[in-house]
Amino acid sequence: MGVTELGKLIGKEARREIKLESLAGKCVALDAYNALYQFLASIRQPDGTPLMDRAGRITSHLSGLFYRTINLLEAGVKPVYVFDGKPPEFKLLEIEQRKKAKEKALEEVEKAIREGRREDVAKYAKRAIFLTSEMVEDAKKLLTYMGIPWVQAPSEGEAQAAHMAKRGHCWAVGSQDYDSLLFGSPRLVRNLAVSPKRKVGEEVVELSPELIELDAVLKSLKLKGREQLIDLAILLGTDYNPEGVPGVGPQKALKLIWEFGSLEKLLQTVLKGVQFPVDPLKIREFFLNPPVTDQYSTELSTPDERKIVELLVEEHDFSQERVAKALERLAKARGKVKTTSLDAFF
């Protein structure tokens, strides 16, 4: 999911860089699809294509999930991955439009490969990322074998993750998107599932985790509550109404919320007669009361190293030596998570 325009309004006073180690002993509910897409976009071969096994199956997501999760454990973080379930009906049109855009990007990739345009291959390949059901199932298998808890959300993953954070079972939600704040998560941590180093032009820059707290966002934007934040996001555009209200940018949307106070009053006045593809009040209700489940665990379990080797090395052609070294790190890191959890408790 993504409410990128809302992110433009969240200033420095509501977000701060933190060290990964500051999350030691804390449970973070990670938006699994968001993380997997990050891995697919960033873990690539020199020609811009994703990592693949000998059968031509993409493995970038498994590589990212395996090694990044170990990094989190080594920092003392307790990750729980939350997977999307069935999207709300009013999101289906947007999903279909995204699919068409990806298919078009895939055509551009194939054309660029034929014409030898390597830079364009990399550019369009990132736009053509697909996450198949088989890839998701492999990711779930890997997490199970690693002893990492994962949760199947009935609907939106970020809604479920926010629910877990609101209940105090997780300290924060981990995602690049801001939707979990709309779903009520008290905290959002960004940049957890991305490489700590990123190339910008010719420079390599450090990318630190970023903490955003819901209360700080509401205070900085002078909003009276989460309902107004949701209304603001709807004006700017969400996954359920990507275009938002035509002609209404971030600053104008904020002023409208300050002046009129609610979406209802706006619909009765300045937005009267504006046609919405989806009822905005229906969208707001979904953010306030999404389908969630209480059937989940945040506890780590014992890894099955043999199963990890079977999945990564034997089935997907990962380097046996690299995986063996990573398994040693995994064993040590799990002990660190247990220790830091006890330290945080006492």
Curated annotation (Swiss-Prot):
CDD domains: H3TH_FEN1-Arc (cd09903), PIN_FEN1 (cd09867). Residues 120-261 are annotated as: I-domain. Mg(2+) 1 binds at residues 31, 84, 156, 158. Mg(2+) 2 binds at residues 177, 179, 239. Its cofactor is Mg(2+). Binds 2 magnesium ions per subunit. They probably participate in the reaction catalyzed by the enzyme. May bind an additional third magnesium ion after substrate binding. SMART domains: HhH2 (SM00279), XPGI (SM00484), XPGN (SM00485). Residues 1-102 are annotated as: N-domain. PROSITE patterns: XPG_1 (PS00841). GO terms for biological process: DNA repair; DNA replication, removal of RNA primer. InterPro entries: 5-3_exonuclease_C_sf, Flap_endonuc, Flap_endonuc_arc, HhH2, PIN-like_dom_sf, XPG-I_dom, XPG/Rad2, XPG_CS. Its EC number is 3.1.-.-. One of its GO terms (molecular function) is DNA binding. Keywords: DNA damage, DNA repair, DNA replication, Endonuclease, Exonuclease, Hydrolase, Magnesium, Metal-binding, Nuclease. The keyword Zinc-finger does not apply. Belongs to the XPG/RAD2 endonuclease family. FEN1 subfamily. Structure-specific nuclease with 5'-flap endonuclease and 5'-3' exonuclease activities involved in DNA replication and repair. During DNA replication, cleaves the 5'-overhanging flap structure that is generated by displacement synthesis when DNA polymerase encounters the 5'-end of a downstream Okazaki fragment. Binds the unpaired 3'-DNA end and kinks the DNA to facilitate 5' cleavage specificity. Cleaves one nucleotide into the double-stranded DNA from the junction in flap DNA, leaving a nick for ligation. Also involved in the base excision repair (BER) pathway. Interacts with PCNA. PCNA stimulates the nuclease activity without altering cleavage specificity. This is Flap endonuclease 1. It comes from Pyrobaculum calidifontis (strain DSM 21063 / JCM 11548 / VA1). The lineage of its organism: Archaea, Thermoproteota, Thermoprotei, Thermoproteales, Thermoproteaceae.
